[in-house]
């Protein structure tokens, strides 16, 4: 076997391989012997068909199969010998084959980039320092109560967190526009559902009042004909309601899985859940900064084959989320996923190099801890842990998560990490 390697462009490579004629003939004869042992031809017993007849009848197809097999095996031998690491599936380009002569073919493919990590010491990471305070727990309890609240009609003016029922008609330059009219429209104030100024124009009014408010559509509004336009909305305020929050009774508390129904038990459970969320949020915040710094410090070429593969993954995930099938997934425009796919490939290659250079392996104690942390959010953690322990694929996925964490920690060990005190709500709002 003769082998030559050339660079086509960037990460592109072409390997040209020549297989000696005698190697081909030896392989063909060997395969014909195997065929002769199995075939049945009228007039001959199984395994007793003369080789010339076997060759005459099956020689062409056997030779084609043998050439395909030799091309594949010789390519693998060649990349091992030349220490080449292909990325993605190779493309075989057969040459002209002539009986009794050497056979030359080429294989085109991309290789993984050679990554030499740099700039780790210049990466800047700000680690949030946060604790869950009693006030944070109080706020979360208020949120839980609001989620379970009922609405009670009131006579007073509209306030920030009330709910209103309105009829409205919108117009621009005196002309009504499509989608600008509704009857018995229920609007919970303070959720930012409407354009700026709409809710502010309703506050302070009482049920039974009719009035007009002036607003301006944002420049980024989805309807082209309304972008940046001044508009008037005629409002008929039909009903005003205020939240009626449930008391922290034993019955209410037990809805959240607190068996003893005590306020202290609920506060403890809420604090535990908030601290788990906080731990995850801090970890994600630090990780995202470390990875962002790693990507900015290391500009690498990316094999197109890996990007294409990642686009296919993202397409299928998108189709699954919206109830689509395999065919619909492949029809989604690649432009929707190209940037995200490239970034994921870059991050994977860089973290892979961190793992390689630091000789990292998944820490089984960390894997165990991650599973226990994840399981603690379920009603029966022991059942979840047991389910994971018996599922090889899930365990391998969790080992990959642990290994990625270890790689990020290796980056952080060299980065400039500073600490900044913040609050629970500030951090969570940054995550949203």
From Swiss-Prot:
Signal peptide: none
Keywords, comma-separated and alphabetical: Cell cycle, Cell division, Chaperone, Cytoplasm, Isomerase, Rotamase
EC category name: isomerase
Catalytic activity, reaction form: [protein]-peptidylproline (omega=180) = [protein]-peptidylproline (omega=0)
Enzyme Commission numbers on file: 5.2.1.8
Highest taxon above the source species: Bacteria
Sequence ranges assigned to domain PPIase FKBP-type in this UniProt record: 161-246
InterPro entries given in the database record: PPIase_dom_sf (IPR046357), PPIase_FKBP_dom (IPR001179), Trig_fac (IPR005215), Trigger_fac_C (IPR008880), Trigger_fac_C_sf (IPR037041), Trigger_fac_ribosome-bd_bac (IPR008881), Trigger_fac_ribosome-bd_sf (IPR036611), Trigger_fact/SurA_dom_sf (IPR027304)
Single GO biological process annotation from the record: 'de novo' cotranslational protein folding
Any Gene Ontology CC annotation: cytoplasm
Main location: cytoplasm
Pfam family, one: Trigger_N
Localization, UniProt: Cytoplasm
Molecular functions per Gene Ontology: peptidyl-prolyl cis-trans isomerase activity; protein folding chaperone; ribosome binding
Job description of the protein: Involved in protein export. Acts as a chaperone by maintaining the newly synthesized protein in an open conformation. Functions as a peptidyl-prolyl cis-trans isomerase.
NCBIfam families from the UniProt entry: tig
Family: Belongs to the FKBP-type PPIase family. Tig subfamily.
Quaternary structure and interacting proteins, as annotated: Homodimer and monomer. In vivo most of the ribosomes are in complex with monomeric TF. Uncomplexed TF, however, is in a monomer-dimer equilibrium with approximately two thirds of TF existing in a dimeric state.
Record remark: domains: Consists of 3 domains; the N-terminus binds the ribosome, the middle domain has PPIase activity, while the C-terminus has intrinsic chaperone activity on its own.
Protein name: Trigger factor
Protein species of origin: Escherichia coli O6:H1 (strain CFT073 / ATCC 700928 / UPEC)
């Amino acid at each position: 076997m003769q082998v030559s390697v050339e660079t086509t462009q960037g990460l592109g490579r072409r390997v040209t391989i020549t297989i000696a004629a005698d190697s081909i003939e030896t392989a063909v004869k060997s395969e014909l012997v195997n065929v002769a042992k199995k075939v049945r031809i009228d007039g001959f017993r199984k395994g007793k068909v003369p080789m010339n007849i076997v060759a005459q009848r099956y020689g062409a197809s056997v030779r084609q199969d043998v050439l395909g097999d030799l091309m594949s095996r010789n390519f693998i031998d060649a990349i091992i010998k030349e220490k080449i690491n292909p990325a993605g599936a190779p493309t075989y380009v057969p040459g002209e084959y002539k009986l009794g002569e050497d056979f030359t073919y080429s294989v085109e493919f991309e290789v993984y980039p050679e990554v030499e990590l740099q700039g780790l010491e210049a990466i800047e990471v700000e680690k949030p320092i946060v604790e869950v305070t009693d006030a944070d727990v109080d706020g979360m309890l208020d949120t839980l109560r609001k989620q379970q609240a009922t609405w009670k009609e009131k006579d007073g003016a509209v306030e920030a967190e009330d709910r209103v029922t309105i009829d409205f008609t919108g117009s621009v330059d005196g002309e009504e526009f499509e989608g600008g009219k509704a009857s018995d429209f229920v609007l919970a104030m303070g959720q930012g559902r409407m354009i700026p100024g709409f809710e502010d124009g309703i506050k302070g009014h009482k049920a039974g009042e009719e009035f007009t408010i002036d607003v301006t559509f944002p420049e980024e509004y989805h309807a082209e004909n309304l972008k940046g336009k001044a508009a008037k909305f005629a409002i008929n305020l039909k009903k005003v309601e205020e939240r009626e929050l449930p008391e922290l009774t034993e019955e209410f508390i037990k809805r959240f899985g607190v068996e003893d129904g005590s306020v202290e038990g609920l506060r403890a459970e809420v604090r535990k859940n908030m601290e788990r969320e906080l731990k995850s949020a801090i970890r994600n915040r630090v990780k995202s900064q470390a990875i962002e710094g790693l990507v900015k410090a290391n500009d690498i070429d990316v094999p197109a084959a890996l990007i294409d593969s990642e686009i296919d993954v993202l397409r299928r995930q998108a189709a699954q989320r919206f109830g689509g099938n395999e065919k619909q997934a492949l029809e989604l425009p690649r432009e929707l996923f190209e940037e995200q796919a490239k970034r994921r490939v870059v991050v994977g290659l860089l973290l892979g190099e961190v793992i390689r250079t630091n000789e990292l392996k998944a820490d089984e104690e960390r894997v165990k801890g991650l599973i226990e942390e994840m399981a603690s959010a379920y009603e029966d953690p022991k059942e979840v842990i047991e389910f994971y322990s018996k599922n090889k694929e899930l365990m391998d996925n969790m080992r990959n998560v642990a290994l990625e964490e270890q790689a990020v920690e290796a980056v952080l060990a060299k980065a400039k990490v500073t600490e900044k005190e913040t609050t629970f709500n500030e951090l969570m709002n940054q995550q949203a």
